[in-house]
């Protein structure tokens, strides 16, 4: 064997055998000749079939004990009984915990977590909201949480949460934006760097047909 061939072999390069260096998955044979693939982006791949995939996933959770248990296991392991706040504010002097202030903070946090305060609809306590968010991510892939900076239910804290199902994001809202050059992609306005700027939500759930009327196609733009 010549010195050149030895050098090529040591470097892992064999000029006479280029075919053998190709990825096996890219070769055409009787086993792969009917294997049709696409090189579309993630958005293009899911566009047009997102709602169908989401609905099938939800039905699977409703009808299958295995899928339902998998969702329950995710919620139990990620959230459990919910986030517990432990305040550790230090005193200005002495380097010790301010126990009195910490107790007041923890009490205020716990009180805000009541369903009449933390949920704009007054239906879910904060632990239930957490479980719903994680469950929706497991089942539907995503969920939206809108922060409302005003008090609800007589709360002293101007802060509450609104859960918005992913169905309400209008995936058909696609195209160029107005003057700023941003682009709408499946209900999400993104800038030149792909950062989400604004969302186009339907004001009513599209599946709530008996109660939606024409208002279902009116958009609520949130940033």
Regions found by a protein language model. Give the residues of each.
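Structured, mid-chain assembly/scaffold modules that mediate subunit interfaces
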Residues: 70-223
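N-terminal-proximal low-complexity accessory segments that begin disordered
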Residues: 1-94
């Amino acid at each position: 064997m010549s010195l050149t061939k030895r050098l090529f072999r040591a470097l892992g390069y064999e000029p006479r055998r280029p075919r053998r260096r190709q990825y096996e998955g890219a070769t055409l044979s009787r086993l792969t000749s009917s294997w049709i693939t696409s090189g579309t982006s993630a958005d293009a791949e899911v566009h047009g079939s997102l709602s169908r995939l989401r609905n099938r996933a939800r039905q699977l959770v409703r009808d299958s004990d295995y899928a339902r248990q998998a969702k329950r296991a995710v919620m139990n392991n990620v959230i459990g009984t919910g986030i517990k706040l432990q305040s550790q504010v230090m005193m200005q002097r002495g380097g010790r915990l301010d126990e009195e202030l910490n107790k007041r903070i923890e009490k205020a946090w716990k009180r805000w977590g009541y369903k009449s305060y933390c949920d704009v609809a007054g239906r879910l306590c904060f632990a239930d909201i957490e479980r719903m968010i994680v469950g929706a991510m497991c089942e539907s892939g995503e969920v939206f949480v809108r922060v409302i900076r005003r008090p609800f239910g007589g709360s002293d804290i101007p802060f509450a949460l609104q859960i918005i199902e992913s169905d309400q994001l209008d995936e058909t809202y696609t195209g160029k934006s107005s003057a700023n050059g941003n682009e709408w992609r499946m209900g999400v306005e993104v800038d030149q760097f792909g950062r989400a700027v604004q969302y186009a939500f339907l004001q009513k759930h599209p599946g709530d047909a008996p109660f939606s009327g024409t208002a279902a196609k009116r958009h609520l733009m949130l940033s």
